[in-house]
A protein has these predicted regions:
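Compositionally biased low-complexity repeats
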Residues: 20-26, 76, 116
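Extracytosolic low-complexity repeat regions of secreted or lipid-anchored proteins
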Residues: 61-116
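Processing junctions and N-termini across compartments
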Residues: 30, 50-53, 78, 97
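Extracellular secreted precursors and ectodomains with disulfide-bonded cysteine-rich loops/domains
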Residues: 34, 54-57, 82, 101
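Short, surface-exposed binding/anchoring microloops in extracellular/periplasmic proteins
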Residues: 39-60
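Secreted, propeptide-processed cysteine-rich mini-domains
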Residues: 25-45
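Secretory targeting and sorting signals
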Residues: 2-23
C-alpha cells in the first residue's frame, strides 16, 4: 500500500511539472549563449535577452531597433538584416500574452522575450 501511495504522489508531481513547463514561458539560456540581463526595450516589454557570437551592448541596440519596428499589428520577422522566428504563448481566451523571438544574421543569434 505504501509503495502505491509513493508512486501516485510521484506521478502527480511529475505530471504537474510537465503541465506547468508547457504552459508558461520560462527564461532559459541555451548552451553557448550569454545572458544579457540589462538588455531591455519598449519600456521593459522586451526583456530576458541572450546572445551567441555577439555582445550584450549589440543586443541592447538591436532590441531598441526591433521595438521601433514593432508598432504594427504583427511582430516584424525581418529587422536590420536579422531574420526572426517568433513563438507565441496564448491565454485561455486565445490572446497572446508573451513571445520568444530568435533573430539570426549569419552566425549572430539574439534571443529575447516579449511579455505583458
Amino acid at each position: 500500500m505504501g509503495r502505491l501511495a509513493v508512486m501516485t504522489v510521484w506521478m502527480a508531481l511529475t505530471l504537474t511539472g510537465v503541465a506547468q513547463a508547457a504552459g508558461r514561458p520560462r527564461y532559459a539560456v541555451p548552451a553557448g549563449f550569454t545572458r544579457c540581463p540589462h538588455a531591455t526595450a519598449w519600456h521593459g516589454f522586451f526583456k530576458w535577452a541572450s546572445q551567441r557570437d555577439s555582445s550584450c551592448a549589440a543586443v541592447h541596440r538591436y532590441m531598441r531597433v526591433y521595438a521601433a519596428h514593432a508598432s504594427g499589428p504583427r511582430m516584424p520577422r525581418h529587422v536590420a538584416g536579422y531574420a526572426c522566428r517568433i513563438h507565441y504563448w496564448r491565454d485561455a481566451d486565445g490572446d497572446i500574452y508573451a513571445s520568444r523571438n530568435t533573430c539570426v544574421r549569419g552566425r549572430l543569434v539574439i534571443r529575447f522575450y516579449g511579455m505583458v
